[in-house]
């Protein structure tokens, strides 16, 4: 086991979990419920499980919503 190195002014929301030997850069924010298994540089905004940049999560959500919309549309076309 090892320690976690948090830079200055790091904000951890509730239920955040950080694995051993992880470094989080200064002025970073980790959103609620995030599980961190890799290092992040300064000024990071982190979220999810596993942890990713919040910007990356937003891109994933947009793609997922588009895919779900296409599935719903295709399903409606198949119904009598």
Task: Identify the residue ranges that each predicted region occupies.
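Structural signal for interior beta-strand "rungs" in well-ordered beta-sheet cores
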Residues: 1-53
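Terminal amphipathic alpha-helical/low-complexity segments used for targeting or macromolecular assembly
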Residues: 44, 51-80
């Amino acid at each position: 086991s090892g320690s976690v190195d948090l830079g200055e002014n790091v904000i951890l929301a509730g239920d955040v979990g950080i694995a051993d030997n992880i470094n989080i850069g200064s002025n970073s924010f980790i959103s609620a419920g995030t599980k961190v298994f890799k290092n992040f540089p300064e000024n990071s905004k982190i979220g999810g499980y596993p942890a990713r940049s919040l910007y990356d999560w937003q891109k994933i959500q947009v793609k997922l919503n588009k895919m779900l919309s296409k599935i719903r549309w295709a399903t409606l076309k198949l119904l009598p």
